[in-house]
Amino acid sequence: MQLTGEMLIGAEAVAGSAGTLRAFDPSKGEPIDAPVFGVAAQADVERACELARDAFDAYRAQPLAARAAFLEAIADEIVALGDALIERAHAETGLPVARLQGERGRTVGQLRLFARVVRDGRFLAASIDPAQPARTPLPRSDLRLQKVGLGPVVVFGASNFPLAFSVAGGDTASALAAGCPVIVKAHEAHLGTSELVGRAIRAAVAKTGMPAGVFSLLVGPGRVIGGALVSHPAVQAVGFTGSRQGGMALVQIANARPQPIPVYAEMSSINPVVLFPAALAARGDAIATGFVDSLTLGVGQFCTNPGLVLAIDGPDLDRFETVAAQALAKKPAGVMLTQGIADAYRNGRGKLAELPGVREIGAGEAAQTDCQAGGALYEVGAQAFLAEPAFSHEVFGPASLIVRCRDLDEVARVLEALEGQLTATLQMDADDKPLARRLLPVLERKAGRLLVNGYPTGVEVCDAMVHGGPFPATSNPAVTSVGATAIERFLRPVCYQDFPDDLLPEGLQESNPLAIPRLRDGKAE
């Protein structure tokens, strides 16, 4: 498929007229010559939003089977892009080919997961409370509930996952599954990859006969184009993965609208790892090497990167640090996604190293180019950590901080001082269970996913996954951005009272022609 640098607005390919952008190859440290990508003008934003608004009712009225087939068609079209997609993503991100192949599998897998969710119909949460005309002292009306899509959704592609959290990523897949048209703001770090995937979606739209306005792809600076999209009255929700600053800027814009809308922003997390005494004594070396592998995976560019380690002071922790430092020293520097991310990592690492009481205990191989970064491991005492809020700030990249605590009570105090997190990990053995049980209440308050004897950098796409957490991990701790229940972000309930049966949505009619799971008087039918 030939790249053109055009945006996709409904069924049309449009050359942006408000400026130009070029893709960048971080491995070579130079721009990619062709194509040049045109930036959206305000008229392009208006057109995409109007098309999405006009497509909403027609799209959500599609049979569930047709909606599911559309999602599967998107997956098929992405696979059909073949090596061209992987090659372009590799050029734009520096990510290894094997990693990108795996990410493509994850991307099409979650599209097919949501197709299954749509076909099953359980997401509609259909519930029926039949009329009770003879009830005293007052009769009860016939009441039936079903969820419907919110309306057009704006999705911001993430820098660190050019496929799985981008144009056809989890936000787009779950919004389309909910019956919502999607407008994607392409991330500037992978413009060509975004165009390829956008064209795959557009091909699926045409093949399945969906309304043209169900999908658009715009290009431009996030602050300008993003602000215009979130402000537009047709837009009813936002999906975002990125920095705390960027996410909160969108939240403020959304809240300032005459009609505020939800922004589901995944932002900042340092993902604490607690090393319990028995586990540290029995297998500290293995934990240390596994931790370093997780820390440096993808040059640390995961929102679930283990950026904080808590442990009780003693010889076993000394050995853990020694082994971790030795393992880190063998790790080569890697190419980060963009020059800006690499610069921010160096800046954040420098600030962390200058905080009171910090000691560097290990480092990976030094960077050889401006877009490369090496790992770093630091140590600080719990009292110093508690005295300085800046220790809780995320350093996006392969850097982590070990906090030495006097006892479990001090571990608990450090955990209490943390902001909300995506994950918290417990490295423990059977003898550690009483200590782990004492920390569970605070861990449950702080994080969306709790792990035992694993590492947080893997996020499975499945029904039970939670990729979310209290602020600032996300802007809304009640939902997840990964897994089947991510669809809940883009739905709202509607109650139908005393409706004629043939005027009800099919899922609420007495004969249940969709054969979806339902509750009747609070019990499964």
UniProtKB/Swiss-Prot annotation:
Entries under CDD domains matching the protein: ALDH_KGSADH (cd07129)
Pathway info: Carbohydrate acid metabolism; D-glucarate degradation; Carbohydrate acid metabolism; galactarate degradation
Active-site annotation: E266, C303
Enzyme superclass (EC): oxidoreductase
Keywords: NAD, NADP, Oxidoreductase
One Gene Ontology MF term: 2,5-dioxovalerate dehydrogenase (NADP+) activity
Binding-site positions, NAD(+): K185, E188, G242, S243, R244, Q245, G246, G247, E394
Induction description: Induced by D-glucarate and D-galactarate.
Top-level lineage group: Bacteria
Biological-process GO terms, alphabetical: D-glucarate catabolic process; galactarate catabolic process
EC number, as in UniProt: 1.2.1.26
UniProt catalytic activity: 2,5-dioxopentanoate + NADP(+) + H2O = 2-oxoglutarate + NADPH + 2 H(+); 2,5-dioxopentanoate + NAD(+) + H2O = 2-oxoglutarate + NADH + 2 H(+)
Function text: Catalyzes the NAD(P)(+)-dependent oxidation of alpha-ketoglutaric semialdehyde (alphaKGSA) to alpha-ketoglutarate. Involved in D-glucarate/D-galactarate metabolism. Prefers NAD(+) to NADP(+) as a cosubstrate.
Family in the record: Belongs to the aldehyde dehydrogenase family.
Subunit structure: Homodimer.
Protein name per UniProt: Alpha-ketoglutaric semialdehyde dehydrogenase 2
Species of the source: Azospirillum brasilense
